[in-house]
A protein has these predicted regions:
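Active-site rim loops that border cofactor/substrate pockets in soluble metabolic enzymes
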Residues: 23-76, 82, 92
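Short, T/G/N/S-enriched strand-turn elements that build extracellular solenoid repeat scaffolds
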Residues: 87-91
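C-terminal functional extensions of proteins
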Residues: 98-174
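General beta-strand structural signal in soluble alpha/beta enzymes
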Residues: 13-17, 78-79, 99, 118-120
Length: 174
């Protein structure tokens, strides 16, 4: 697979999946441990309502600052923006955020928090970056397909339509 975790597997990294997804104060430091926990918990979690683990609707706007130390001790914070926004402290000076589904208002909030760089994994269109699933659906529609495409087909269309990530310098690093 070519997920965000694979990008960081050779770096010093802490995965916050248990911390922010399940409120279990246990950072994971390798893809192997992430895989082990996923194998253990996925059979149970997939039978429960998504809303128990993921902010839906108005819950996406509700902030609950939690586990601040993990935000502050990492230079790069990567993941789902709904989780980042929900749990982040008010100040993240000099941090780099890698995410998507960011609006213009979210960018301003990150600027006010002191975030130095925002990288979205999908392009910014009309002031917001969309989720990867939205971009995948767009590519499937552009291809005229009624099913998911192969990795090669996605890459071909990404090149054809010049779809790129976005990097914004929000604040000078303190």
């Amino acid at each position: 697979s070519r997920g965000l975790g694979d990008v960081y597997k050779r770096q010093e990294v802490s995965f916050g999946d248990l911390i922010f997804g399940l409120n279990i104060d246990k950072p994971l430091y390798s893809l192997k441990s992430l895989g082990w926990w996923a194998e253990l918990l996925a059979p149970l979690i997939t039978k429960l309502p998504v809303s128990w683990f993921y902010p839906m609707g108005k819950q996406q706007e509700k902030r609950t600052v939690r586990h601040t130390k993990y935000f502050l001790e990492n230079d790069i914070i990567a993941g789902d923006f709904h989780f980042i926004k929900k749990f982040m402290p008010d100040k993240l000076p000099g941090k780099i955020i890698i995410t998507n589904t960011v609006t213009a208002a979210d960018r301003e909030m990150l600027r006010q928090a002191g975030v130095s760089i925002l990288i979205t994994t999908t392009p910014c269109l009309e002031g917001r970056s969309f989720g990867t699933n939205v971009m995948e659906a767009l590519l499937v529609a552009l291809k005229g397909s009624n099913k998911a495409l192969s990795a090669e087909e996605y890459l071909e269309l990404i090149e054809q339509y010049h779809i790129e990530s976005s990097t914004e310098y929000l604040c000078a690093k303190e």
